[in-house]
Every structure is written in structure tokens, then in C-alpha cells.
Amino acid sequence: MKETGIHNKAASISTSGLKELSAVFYNLGPARLYEETIRRGEAELSAQGALVARTGQHTGRSPKDKFVVRDANTEDHVWWDNNKPMTPEAFELLYADFIEHAKGRELFVQDLIGGADADNKINARVITEYAWHSLFIRNLLIRPSQEALASYVPEMTIIDLPSFKADPERYGVRTETVIAVDLTRKIVLIGGTSYAGEMKKSVFTALNYILPAKGVMPMHCSANEGPNGDTAVFFGLSGTGKTTLSADPTRTLIGDDEHGWGEHGVFNFEGGCYAKTIRLSAEAEPEIYATTQRFGTVLENVVLDENRQPDFDDGSLTENTRCAYPLDFIPNASKSGKGGQPKNIIMLTADAFGVMPPIAKLTPAQAMYHFLSGYTAKVAGTEKGVTEPEATFSTCFGAPFMPRHPSEYGNLLRKLIAEHKVDCWLVNTGWTGGAYGVGKRMPIKATRALLAAALDGSLNNAEFRIDPNFGFAVPVEVPGVENSILDPRSTWADKVAYDAQAKKLVDMFVSNFEKFESHVDHEVKDAAPAIRMAAE
């Protein structure tokens, strides 16, 4: 078996049972991985030098094909309502078949780290069948120094073989695609999908399981730091403005997607970014756009024209086009991946019902309520004339990656907020003056002004009113922002329609929260919007 590249000889991939391979490439850098990718016909080059790969039928994650091993260790700690179980026996059989399938193949190994905090990191070894997958994950996780690689010992292993097709009957799975996670042995097997995001989210899932037991809060969020060292955390589902609003030229970007919060402050789990590129432009997002125009970046499912120019407006393969690049491709990114204790937490929502104010201050109990709710609203497709928005609730702002019960994360968040006296804000980047189809999108200028006032501390001195529907505190006046926009009801021409819409949204919150009622105390229950409606 031919082995090339720097690695710890005492911890080769044979320790994972992988033997009789034709070749193993350890820790290759971008240039070598480009050569191997092109040699094997896995991807193309863009005119600017990015590596452009297509993932075939899977252009996103396959959450319905993800399984967690249910054993004596995970039985009482995993939220089984949200995680599909797999027996240890089925996993063992799958693992043996993965090892058999790999024989005679070339494999690529990247020895990486998840977590910028030395006390709360995991050494994650990622073994891939595709060379471009190796570059992708190298871009996204934290890369150890060349010296550290010689003594690197993996704590977690991911084996990604897209050519492996699972037999549903043999393993008790759903389709030919499988993502099997053994949290006890820290082994992840990915088969039957070429979508690279599965590898990244597997490390996130492992950290989301391991860290709460150490009192560290894992978060699906972006984070940045101001010139005075004040850290801000941004929670938000897709389409709420998390990436856009945390990419602030006056602040240092800590990371765009996954972080931990522990005794030393906030730290990035990753060493790179995985940004959406659909309709990306140099004018709207210059920093992200610049990363797509250079060597080393991986473009996923981006369409190229005959001159190999990327067309970011072309969504014919998928709307979920992406680019993966190291964090240091962003000019004002943190070199350490670490920030202090957060001063502000921002929970972003895009309320397409037009009911919520552009900003509200939350108590720790209200913050836990809205964190567990994880609300935003998607706009329905207009091709059939459907203009009714659709409410989306994804608990902890990232339900698919949370192995434990949401209340564990919620209680930990609330404890840390109280302990460090963090100011919490709910920011609505959705609609004002009416619901989607009637009102207009919240002006980004107003959102940025409100955010700036929250982050510099001046908003704390404003006069607040209590919102009659949600019970949180809303500023009455903020310099540089029209007063009317701060009171959503006043922006609606039809006040009766507003009240009806507000009641409808409140009812959705209440109905969604029923599953958490037995897991929270009275203070959090009292943060529910329905309580306020009843008290009116």
C-alpha cells in the first residue's frame, strides 16, 4: 500500500481497519489536491482558478438518511424524537462493508481539528474517496501545523465513500444513501451521496453531543468582535441575514456558522466558511465574491459557461450553490478563531407575516423561549399565486444537528446569559407595513442602524414599551430610524388585519411550544406570547 504525505506513522489509517488500499494520500495541500482532482476527472477549473465540483443527485444534506447508534451510552442522552436510531449490530455490519468496499481504492486523509479552544476541541480525521472532498474539508476545518501532524492522533474518524450504495434491507436504512453516526466510538460513515456538507455537519453533530456534558454551549450561529473586544453572537435560520449582518467591515469575523461558548468565551469550531453563492454579486457581498475568484476555493454545483466563467445567477443544478474557502481568505477574519465572553446575542428572524418589531430586548427566560422556538417564516412559491407565508420553527436554530434534547441546550444558554449578563435582542429582518405581498422588506439600513445601537450599548438607554402580543421590550425611539417602523401595528393601513395576523402568529408559537412545556420552568412558560394576549 503506497502512503504519501506527512502523518503520524503510529496512527495510520490501518488503525481504522482500512487495509489493502492502492494508495493513501495524507494531508495534501491545495495544489496537490487540484492535481489529483483533475487527474481523476472529479471537477473542473474556473477561469479564475477555483475548483468547481458537481454533486449529482444530492445537492443538499439528506437528513432523512442520517442515523445515530442507539447504545447504552447514548440511550438516555440523545433526543430520539429527532434522531433516527441504528442498532450497534447494523453499524458494525455497515462499517465492515465500508472497509471491504474501500479495498483496492485510493483514499485521501485530512487530519484536522474541530474547535479553536484547546480545552474543547476534537481531532477529526476525514478519509475521503474524492480528492475534491479532501480539499473541501481541509478548507472548512482547522488545519494543524506541519509539525503537529507528525504526532497527530485522531479522536474522531469520518469515512466518506460516495460510491458505496447502502442496502436498506441489510442495514435497516431508508435508501442507498446513509449517514451513520456512532457517538460512542466517534465514527461517522457517509455513503451514497457526493454532497460535501455532510462531512462538515458530522463534526458539528459530534461537538453538539460532547460539549454540553462539559458545560460548553455549542451554537449554530455566526460571531464577530468589535474594536473594543466586545463579542456578538448571531443566531438565525437560513435567509434571515446571519452571514450578511455578521460580515461587518468595522468588526472582526470570528466565524460564520458553528461556535462554542465556554469559560474562556466564544470560539469557532471551524477554520473556513461555506457560503451560499446563488445570485452572489461583487456589489452586495464583495468579500465573499472575492473568495470565489481565486485558487484554493471550492465551488459546489455552480454552473460554468464555455469559457469557464461561473454564473452565480444560474440555479439550474440547485438553488443551494456554495463556495468553501479558508477563513483567512476574508480580510477582517480573526486569526485565532476566538472571542471573549459575548456582550450581545442577536436572534434573527425574517417574519414574513409582518407582525414582529424590527428589534426587541429579551430577558434570559424570553431568550430561552425564542431559542427553543427557533422561528422564521419562508415565503411560499409565487408561481401558483400562493402569497401566504409559511412559518418555520427549527429548535435551537439548528434542529438537524442537535443530538441532545433542546431543553439541555436551552438551559445551558439561559445559565450562561445570566452568568455573563449578556444583552439579548430579537431582530426581525422580515416584512413591515403588512405581510409578504402587501408590505415591504425591512430596510437593511434600518436593521444595521438598530444593530449598531444594540452593539455599542446605546440602545440600552432608550425608552421601551412592552409589546402587547409577545411581551418583550421594544424601543420607542432610536436615532437614525423612523419611529413608525418600531411599532409594526402603526405601519399597517388595516389595524384589524394586523391584530388578526398577530393572533395567528401567536397561536403558531403556542402550538409549536407545546412539546417543550414539560421541560421548562414557569419563568420560560410565562415568556410565551399567549400569556400576554390573555392578560390584555
UniProtKB/Swiss-Prot annotation:
<dbReference type="InterPro" id="IPR015994">
    <property type="entry name" value="PEPCK_ATP_CS"/>
</dbReference>
<feature type="binding site">
    <location>
        <begin position="236"/>
        <end position="244"/>
    </location>
    <ligand>
        <name>ATP</name>
    </ligand>
</feature>
<feature type="binding site">
    <location>
        <position position="201"/>
    </location>
    <ligand>
        <name>substrate</name>
    </ligand>
</feature>
<feature type="binding site">
    <location>
        <position position="220"/>
    </location>
    <ligand>
        <name>Mn(2+)</name>
    </ligand>
</feature>
<feature type="binding site">
    <location>
        <position position="447"/>
    </location>
    <ligand>
        <name>ATP</name>
    </ligand>
</feature>
<dbReference type="GO" id="GO:0005524">
    <property type="term" value="F:ATP binding"/>
</dbReference>
<dbReference type="InterPro" id="IPR001272">
    <property type="entry name" value="PEP_carboxykinase_ATP"/>
</dbReference>
<dbReference type="InterPro" id="IPR013035">
    <property type="entry name" value="PEP_carboxykinase_C"/>
</dbReference>
<keyword id="KW-0312">Gluconeogenesis</keyword>
<comment type="function">
    <text>Involved in the gluconeogenesis. Catalyzes the conversion of oxaloacetate (OAA) to phosphoenolpyruvate (PEP) through direct phosphoryl transfer between the nucleoside triphosphate and OAA.</text>
</comment>
<keyword id="KW-0210">Decarboxylase</keyword>
<feature type="binding site">
    <location>
        <position position="285"/>
    </location>
    <ligand>
        <name>ATP</name>
    </ligand>
</feature>
<feature type="binding site">
    <location>
        <position position="201"/>
    </location>
    <ligand>
        <name>ATP</name>
    </ligand>
</feature>
<dbReference type="GO" id="GO:0006094">
    <property type="term" value="P:gluconeogenesis"/>
</dbReference>
<comment type="pathway">
    <text>Carbohydrate biosynthesis; gluconeogenesis.</text>
</comment>
<feature type="binding site">
    <location>
        <position position="195"/>
    </location>
    <ligand>
        <name>substrate</name>
    </ligand>
</feature>
<keyword id="KW-0067">ATP-binding</keyword>
<dbReference type="GO" id="GO:0004612">
    <property type="term" value="F:phosphoenolpyruvate carboxykinase (ATP) activity"/>
</dbReference>
<feature type="binding site">
    <location>
        <position position="322"/>
    </location>
    <ligand>
        <name>ATP</name>
    </ligand>
</feature>
<feature type="binding site">
    <location>
        <position position="61"/>
    </location>
    <ligand>
        <name>substrate</name>
    </ligand>
</feature>
<feature type="binding site">
    <location>
        <position position="220"/>
    </location>
    <ligand>
        <name>ATP</name>
    </ligand>
</feature>
<feature type="binding site">
    <location>
        <position position="257"/>
    </location>
    <ligand>
        <name>Mn(2+)</name>
    </ligand>
</feature>
<keyword id="KW-0547">Nucleotide-binding</keyword>
<dbReference type="GO" id="GO:0005829">
    <property type="term" value="C:cytosol"/>
</dbReference>
<dbReference type="InterPro" id="IPR008210">
    <property type="entry name" value="PEP_carboxykinase_N"/>
</dbReference>
<protein>
    <recommendedName>
        <fullName>Phosphoenolpyruvate carboxykinase (ATP)</fullName>
        <ecNumber>4.1.1.49</ecNumber>
    </recommendedName>
</protein>
<comment type="similarity">
    <text>Belongs to the phosphoenolpyruvate carboxykinase (ATP) family.</text>
</comment>
<keyword id="KW-0456">Lyase</keyword>
<dbReference type="GO" id="GO:0046872">
    <property type="term" value="F:metal ion binding"/>
</dbReference>
<feature type="binding site">
    <location>
        <position position="322"/>
    </location>
    <ligand>
        <name>substrate</name>
    </ligand>
</feature>
<keyword id="KW-0479">Metal-binding</keyword>
<keyword id="KW-0963">Cytoplasm</keyword>
<dbReference type="Pfam" id="PF01293">
    <property type="entry name" value="PEPCK_ATP"/>
</dbReference>
<keyword id="KW-0464">Manganese</keyword>
<feature type="binding site">
    <location>
        <position position="201"/>
    </location>
    <ligand>
        <name>Mn(2+)</name>
    </ligand>
</feature>
